[in-house]
Amino acid sequence: MIRIGVLGPVGSGKTTLIEFLTEYLVKKEGLSVGIITNDVISSHDALRIYQNLVLKEKLLPKENVIGIVTGGCPHTAIREDPSVNLRALETLMKRTSLDVIFIESGGDNVMSTFSPILADYTIFVLDTAAGDKYPGKGGLGIQESDLLVVNKIDLAPFVGADLEKMRRDAEKIRKDKPTVFISLKTGDGIDDLIKIIRSELELEGLIRS
């Protein structure tokens, strides 16, 4: 079983990414998936996932989704004091046998990271609508995440974001750690994303090459 932490600023596409990867892992790889969401003041993301993946697509049983309302700084619940998320993990694992558990952080800044006792693998999500400056600015989330996902590349021409600049800056900041440029709306770059995720799952012994 692998715990995948997904974090990034508000509106970058974290929930959409989790929904996409869950559909892929369940339908294409035959894996069992659980999801924990963190929101500051509501369970909006958990409700959305429940409506889309449980009710509409029928990909997950309802007991595989847990929503947490943190009521404070989003990073506290995933880093400084992850106890509420650890309890949610324990609850999920008692309910059913799972291969992958996604833990979605509440929207936060580029300094956010997951505690290593909470997540085995981390994905930081940026989007081009926020501009092309973020990879170059660094921050622990961008630097230390196992995978950096730059989402909404279809919007780059409309917001003046230079994708090549973002690519160069990411390579400089992240060294040999992977970065993928995707659009979850158009499907651009999705093959690269899946290749990286599959590679990690192969290392964990969850799927075969």
UniProtKB/Swiss-Prot annotation:
It is found in: Cytoplasm. Coiled coil: none annotated. It holds the Pfam family cobW. Gene3D superfamilies: P-loop containing nucleotide triphosphate hydrolases. GO terms for molecular function: GTP binding; GTPase activity; nickel cation binding. GO terms for biological process: urea catabolic process. The keyword Nuclease does not apply. GTP binds at G8, P9, V10, G11, S12, G13, K14, T15. One of its GO terms (cellular component) is cytoplasm. The keyword Hydrolase does not apply. Keywords: Chaperone, Cytoplasm, GTP-binding, Nickel insertion, Nucleotide-binding. Facilitates the functional incorporation of the urease nickel metallocenter. This process requires GTP hydrolysis, probably effectuated by UreG. Belongs to the SIMIBI class G3E GTPase family. UreG subfamily. NCBIfam families: ureG (TIGR00101). Homodimer. UreD, UreF and UreG form a complex that acts as a GTP-hydrolysis-dependent molecular chaperone, activating the urease apoprotein by helping to assemble the nickel containing metallocenter of UreC. The UreE protein probably delivers the nickel. PANTHER family: UREASE ACCESSORY PROTEIN G (PTHR31715:SF0). This is Urease accessory protein UreG. It comes from Sulfurisphaera tokodaii (strain DSM 16993 / JCM 10545 / NBRC 100140 / 7) (Sulfolobus tokodaii). The lineage of its organism: Archaea, Thermoproteota, Thermoprotei, Sulfolobales, Sulfolobaceae. The gene is ureG.
